[in-house]
Amino acid sequence: MVAHLNIHTSFDLLDSSLRIDALIDKAKKEGYRALAITDTNVLYGYPKFYDACIAAHIHPIFGMTIYLTDGLYTIETVVLAKNNQGLKSLYQISSAIMMRNKEEVPIEWLKRYDEHLIIIFKEAELSHKQIIDAFEGKKELYLNHNSNNTLTGKRVWMQSARYLNEDDAETIPALHAIRDNTKLDLIHEKETLDEHFPSIEELQTLNLSEDMITNANEIEELCQAEIAYHQSLLPQFVTPNGETSKDYLWTILIHRLREWELNDKTYFNRLKHEYKIITDMGFEDYFLIVSDLIHFAKTHEVMVGPGRGSSAGSLVSYLLGITTIDPLKYNLLFERFLNPERVTMPDIDIDFEDTRREKVIKYVQDKYGEHHVSGIVTFGHLLARAVARDVGRIMGFDETSLNEISKLIPHKLGITLEEAYQKPEFKAFVHRNHRNERWFEVSKKLEGLPRHTSTHAAGIIINDQPLFKFAPLTTGDTGLLTQWTMTEAERIGLLKIDFLGLRNLSIIHQIILQVKKDLNINIDIEAIPYDDKKVFDLLSNGDTTGIFQLESDGVRSVLKRLQPEHFEDIVAVTSLYRPGPMEEIPTYITRRHNPNQVAYLHPDLEPILKNTYGVIIYQEQIMLIASQVAGFSYGEADILRRAMSKKNRAILESERQHFIDGAKNNGYGEQISKQIFDLILKFADYGFPRAHAVSYSKIAYIMSYLKVHYPHYFYANILSNVIGSEKKTAAMIDEAKHQRISILPPNINQSHWYYKASNKGIYLSLGTIKGIGYQSVKLIIDERQQNGPYRDFFDFSRRIPKRVKNRKLLESLILVGAFDTFGKTRATLLQAIDQVLDLNSDVEQDEMLFDLLTPKQSYEEKEELPDQLLSDYEKEYLGFYISKHPVEKKFEKKQYLGIFQLSNGSHYQPILVQFDHIKQIRTKNGQNMAFVTMNDGRTMMDGVIFPDKFKKFETSISKEQMYIVLGKFEKRNQQMQLIINQLFEVEAYEQTKLSNSKKVILRNVTHLEPQFEHSKVESNEQHALNIYGFDESANKMTMLGQIERQRQNFDLLIQTYSPADIRFI
């Protein structure tokens, strides 16, 4: 016997450690002829198992373990598919089990599908006779070798295999402990296990009967199911009048061509070309299906992106409304998207606004029906950090040890435990004791195994037949899922469309709706001008916070250097700012400003590379060069591009010769042909799809346009989308203030959960206030909308429900200014809280009873709280300052010291800051240093204080104080940071500065005020301080006199003139 009929792979989640690759390797070495995958209830591993078996020339058998019940007794049962019909039966049984969350399978379910299945009962006892008899007369029915001897039936050897070798037995109790969240009793549980994958030699020692061997061979011969890949499973689109999809598609396309007045012959010829390829390849239904769902979205208040990926290169997509990018206008190639030489399903991914994406999915589900639409499964795995903690937990490690493990494993994508072991600290931990060594061994054996299922973020499968006919289904958080991954589902021929949710589309849509509601202006984003100077000024200034694709510090730096003037500049920046092509950015910018420096390897390359100043940026440029120079069809050119990006040496050499031969046939010399090939080879690795770049640059431009022309609405919506992120909110608030947009305190009669734009400024969200949850805000707003604005603080307190009214809520609202609209100081309102909390709640809810039975409420007027305290409360409850930041206030008062802000400071200039975060660490040498986050009231920046500077302040440095810092600016991870060399408390710095000053300069002052007469001194006095007036308009300095160097005179100067107009030098 050379078949194993009962293998549980690692896709039997947390119940097997048998990896398919390792299983097949061992099976091949041992000489196994056939293997059967029999995971319990699920078929997750089928495609991977099938592919691995075929590659190793092993006969794959498809099966499943189920627990069959007659309602009284249950028996472990293995069912195997005889043929492809049996395979479909397994799909349907598994789907039913997973969709109905069944642990046991009723006999009736199996009997419905048993015609094309082999049934093997395991460890059958007399109590199971009724279940076995239910299948009386079925020829392909077996009992396994250790079933009760008194039962009649054909016998076959069948023993579960759940781990590879005998010494892997410990993996099963470990997996079970992880699954059940229990502690691991390794020694006890290992003794009971005997489920390794045996060698052929071990099978031979079992002395199996001839009947068992014959039956096993018989089963192997009977099982001939195969997974059919690349089936034609596209659903048919139902046309309105019963005409063919081809005819219906052509009718729509011609109508749109005329309707949009695209009468140029080039459009018609391009349309005929694309239509022929699409219909020849049988994809007309696909385009109609996608067009239909996008049409639904656009007519049901769901914003759709202009395009995504290479599909924006299709004129058919444009005419159907799938994209809003005219491919001829932007010189985009259809063949980058679809061509006859690359016979794969076209890939149209769609961006929807993220808050309404589910509406479109619901439409598709309703249109195609139950079981016809599903999401796609993904698997979470036991990766290094997770498996290390899981195994540590089940082995009883305390929290300190678990945290130590987490710190010892580097934060690196794809890190393995073996790689972590190369670090001395990790190795020392492993060998600290025997328990840690066992922990490491068990963790390594489990590392990488699938742990749980999840849902693919975007993929949706659609068919006009129930999906369980083609693949097994399961359920996830969002509904039905295929049990197979995206790649596997697509490979069998199922239609997959990515429904992606894009937050920026939601922001754009909300801005459009609010502008219409408040200003009665209809913004048609398809009609905005793409040569708006204000937009390009914004981009050139790098004011791109909140702009899709353009808001990182690195991109802003590029925009400032580039000074974009055309839409094409945006397309280029979004394509270049990625690892790889970034190195071409300086070249691109230099040539953009100096076009005369552009040189082309050959004149024929100029029309293709002119827009990008001789730099190859886009994949389409590679295809155009291959077509122009070597005479490649665009399909051949796309194959060349793909071969270049994959760097397959054998294919590359073949394509190189193909290119050179084609170029020579076109009249190019061999040397220039080689040079051009090498040129495109250099850029092929990171060339970007131009169609995608144009699509996403359009979103970036639209957002920039809205930011320029409707800034209040732009910032309000960006802020609404970062509620919950204190850091992002603070940064956006600071920028809005910098743009001179008023940020208004929360207003109990104006604010909502989201930020609200108004002609006065932007009202803060009630949801921003710490300690006030969504339900409380909802109740406050609902009451206001139903019964009108709140009249005063007492009216508010009476009308809100008792379950949300408490001291914490009222204090929070008062201290952030939500009741300022009523004209009372915050101190007065705080004094009134006790009054409103003492009232009888039942009386409050009845306005008439309230007026009759309660004494007249009155305020005890109090002076307002000090400015600093008000600011502190704002920071405490909001995470940022609404009014001027205390550092900004201090800066305005102390400008006479010649201090700077983070945004305009240079190396070693004094900058006034406060530390928002201080992270103290110990170096390898045992010295303390600190990483800090600095705030100057407008800008936040990270900083470093090294040990030699930090030791002076490590016991006194505080987030409550302000400091003057000096240091060197450096870029780290594309972000500026300050290496702090000197740090002073403000008072100490001021005292030193004033004491050492030699002169004072007064801006735009021509003479000293009379009050300084008594302070004047003769020029030869030792303690004299020279006073100069500086005339800005004339750029002229004039000596105004001298005063005695005394603190009282300094203070008099500061009181008499604006701090901004004084500089002590």
UniProtKB/Swiss-Prot annotation:
This is DNA polymerase III subunit alpha. It comes from Staphylococcus epidermidis (strain ATCC 12228 / FDA PCI 1200). DNA polymerase III contains a core (composed of alpha, epsilon and theta chains) that associates with a tau subunit. This core dimerizes to form the PolIII' complex. PolIII' associates with the gamma complex (composed of gamma, delta, delta', psi and chi chains) and with the beta chain to form the complete DNA polymerase III complex. One of its GO terms (molecular function) is 3'-5' exonuclease activity. It is found in: Cytoplasm. GO terms for biological process: DNA replication. Keywords: Cytoplasm, DNA replication, DNA-directed DNA polymerase, Nucleotidyltransferase, Transferase. Belongs to the DNA polymerase type-C family. DnaE subfamily. The gene is dnaE. Pfam families: DNA_pol3_alpha, DNA_pol3_finger, HHH_6, PHP, tRNA_anti-codon. It comes from the Bacteria.
